[in-house]
């Protein structure tokens, strides 16, 4: 197959950041994706309906002229979140609340420290129809970073899912066979997103031959057996798994430092890279479901009506992109060849 047309896709997990960065990140995503779930981990975090609505307006202001791109907003759960916050968020059009264990990722220090105390909030979310998006890692300092996802399932996620069967839960950016198996065996209210980097890479691509800071993300890349498990589940076409890039921009100097930031900025190549993965797996017929159907169906939103055409044509991801402030950012797969390309009119 040398050409593939799919329903216009959505990105069910990304980071736009804020301020001048929006002039880069919003157009990069809006070129192909009609909607995106926008993460709330700003400084300060987006913890309520008012902050979410204001952030949404800043994103809309950064859309390219004529764009119909729609940001889908989320709020950031803390131990101070109330049921009224959930009610107000739902009324304001917020679609989900994000659970970050404190310290799990960029700007998550304000997040949840006593997870069991949030069970009344999960009950409110179940009642009012707000989805729960989970960064599924434990964060105690003595626990090995490669074990944190599996332990989160065991300690917390299984209990949350069992306690709230009417609560839709998205296990975001899964990285392990443990997570894939958990989602596959869970009830229909549980789904997962998978990033391009976790399908394309494993921890050797981060650590062998020198540290590769632009492949560093959280949850961290795992061993190849976990990568292969993720590739296997997307190849099945299961509706429980859908596209979430976790595109997460950081300026070049913040990645290439003694204490580099976590995140891969994949917005400019994500769909094409997913196509490459599905092609490698002999499963191109499953790409449309993963990119364009399973996500809206799980969220209870209409599927998009437009289409995107990909052609089998090699191109090279730019080595750098210059941000509006003049600083460079290195995109994911910078300088690498990609075998699929979006066809432009």
UniProtKB/Swiss-Prot annotation:
PROSITE patterns tied to this protein: DIHYDROOROTASE_1, DIHYDROOROTASE_2
InterPro entries documented for this protein: Amidohydro-rel, DHOdimr, Dihydroorotase_CS, Metal_Hydrolase
Molecular function via GO: dihydroorotase activity; zinc ion binding
Binding, Zn(2+) 1: 13, 15, 98, 246
Bound cofactor: record note: Binds 2 Zn(2+) ions per subunit.
EC number: 3.5.2.3
Pathway the protein takes part in: Pyrimidine metabolism; UMP biosynthesis via de novo pathway; (S)-dihydroorotate from bicarbonate: step 3/3
Cofactors (names): Zn(2+)
Binding, Zn(2+) 2: 98, 135, 173
Active-site annotation: 246
GO CC terms: cytosol
GO terms, biological process: 'de novo' pyrimidine nucleobase biosynthetic process; 'de novo' UMP biosynthetic process
Disulfide bonds: none
Residues involved in substrate binding: 15-17, 41, 135, 218, 250, 262
Function (record text): Catalyzes the reversible cyclization of carbamoyl aspartate to dihydroorotate.
Subunit and interaction comment: Homodimer.
HAMAP family found in the cross-reference section: PyrC_classII
Homology family: Belongs to the metallo-dependent hydrolases superfamily. DHOase family. Class II DHOase subfamily.
NCBIfam families on file: pyrC_dimer (TIGR00856)
Protein name: Dihydroorotase
Species: Shewanella piezotolerans (strain WP3 / JCM 13877)
């Amino acid at each position: 197959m040398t050409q593939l047309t799919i329903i216009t896709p959505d990105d069910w997990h990304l980071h736009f950041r804020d301020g001048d960065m929006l002039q880069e990140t919003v157009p990069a995503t809006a070129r192909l994706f009609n909607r995106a779930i926008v993460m709330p981990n700003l400084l300060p975090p987006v913890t309520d309906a008012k902050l979410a609505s204001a952030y949404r307006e800043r994103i809309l202001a950064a859309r390219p002229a004529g764009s119909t791109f729609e940001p889908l907003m989320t709020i950031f759960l803390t131990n101070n979140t109330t049921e009224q916050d959930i009610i107000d968020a739902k009324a304001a059009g917020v679609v989900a609340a994000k659970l970050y264990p404190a310290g799990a990722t960029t700007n998550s220090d304000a997040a949840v420290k006593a997870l069991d105390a949030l069970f009344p909030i999960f009950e409110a979310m179940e009642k009012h129809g707000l989805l729960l998006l989970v960064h599924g890692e434990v964060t105690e300092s003595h626990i090995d970073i490669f074990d944190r996802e599996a332990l989160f399932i065991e300690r917390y996620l299984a209990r949350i899912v069992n306690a709230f069967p009417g609560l839709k839960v998205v296990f975001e950016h899964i990285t392990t066979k443990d997570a894939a198996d958990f989602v596959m065996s869970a009830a229909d209210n549980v789904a997962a997103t998978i990033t391009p980097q976790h399908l394309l890479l494993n921890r050797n691509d981060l650590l062998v031959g020198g540290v590769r800071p632009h492949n560093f993300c959280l949850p961290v890349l795992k061993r190849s057996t976990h990568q292969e498990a993720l590739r296997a589940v997307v190849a099945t076409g299961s509706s429980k798994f859908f596209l979430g890039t976790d595109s997460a921009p950081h300026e070049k100097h913040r990645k290439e430092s003694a204490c580099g930031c976590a995140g891969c900025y994949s917005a400019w190549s994500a769909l094409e890279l997913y196509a490459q993965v599905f092609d490698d797996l002999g499963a191109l017929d499953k790409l449309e479901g993963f990119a364009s159907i399973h996500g809206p169906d799980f969220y209870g939103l209409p599927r998009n009506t437009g289409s995107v055409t990909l052609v089998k044509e090699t191109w090279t991801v730019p080595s750098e992109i210059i941000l509006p402030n003049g600083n460079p950012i290195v995109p994911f797969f910078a300088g690498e060849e990609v075998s699929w390309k979006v066809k432009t009119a």
